[in-house]
Amino acid sequence: MKTKNLLKLATLSVITLFLGVIQSCSPEQAESGGQLYDLGTGMESRSISFENPTGEPGQGGQAESNLGVGRKGFPAKGIAPGETVVLCDIAGAGTIRHIWMTGGFKDRTEALRSMVVRAYWENQEHPSVECPLGDFMGSAHAKANSYQSAVHSVGERASLNIWLPMPFNEHAKMTLTNDGDENITLFYQIDYTIGDRHPEKLGRLHVCFVRENPTTLTTDFEILPKRIGEGRFIGTVLGVRTLEGNWWGEGEVKIFMDGDTEFPTICGTGSEDYVCVSYGMQQTPFFYHGCSWNKDGFISMYRWHLPDPIYWKKECRITIQQIGWSREYVEETGSALYERKDDWSSATFWYEPLPSAKLPEFPDLESRVANLWEEPEE
């Protein structure tokens, strides 16, 4: 009897585990092309690189090297100062599934902030994505430290990956501009599908970059400046350069949506709490949250709202406070909390339908690269 009960329990456990795996995989697999075994999606796979800049069938690897035609003839290209390279120009319906890049980033401090990614969906004149390459690829402060999350993976030698689906119905164009003063070698590959059957209410990926150096005392930093219309907040890559000692991260994230005025619908409890760590900032990169860099007063952290979606129907604005903690303030104010100023940046990701409003004004090169790797004053 005991053996039968144990066998039943083991069988039930296996079935539960199996069903749990199927259930947990389904939502994300639906976004990335359906179940792994579904061969009836009607989609076709394509890839764009310098070896096949159009992604057309049978057109890859035609360039010639010293080894002959088709033998690694055009894997990379140097991007001159001021030059803009078209990464892809795709007609028809499809979804960009993955982008990989590497090149002359690792030993050039400013390169990941001086190079700018822009994306245009459905021939809209203004970009829906406008962001420094490093922040778009998951790392603040132009520091490509090795880590992995649900959205990004970064290798030790600045191999950069992003895995967010970027759907389009009629047209997709992405560019990369070198605003710096040095020639930068670029290797890249964009993997995408065509023939996708998108939902009627299709959100397109939007990404904006904001930096305040320094922030304004008692004026909360905007992670997502106000957007009108419906959308879904995906997450953000946040950079902090502390401008003084003491603990900097008591500020709360506030998500104002759908008519909120003075007080938000969603309110966090602290800066490190928002990225799901606690009692200070530890360099701990996890799947949906964490910190990929924490050294000498420079912090790069992230939060992805994939299993815990944040939707809005009419409008949304997201902020984070700049509040510190130090015992030296207790005698003066009765509390260890105090307002402070630091250097904050954000690369924020969300989906919204088209046509969409212009993104906030993009910071110029000087503003983007200022104070990289300056140690904070004690």
Located regions from the model:
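Bacterial N-terminal signal peptides that target proteins for export
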Residues: 2-11
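Bacterial N-terminal signal peptides
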Residues: 10-21
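Beta-strand-centric surfaces of beta-sandwich/beta-rich domains
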Residues: 28-378
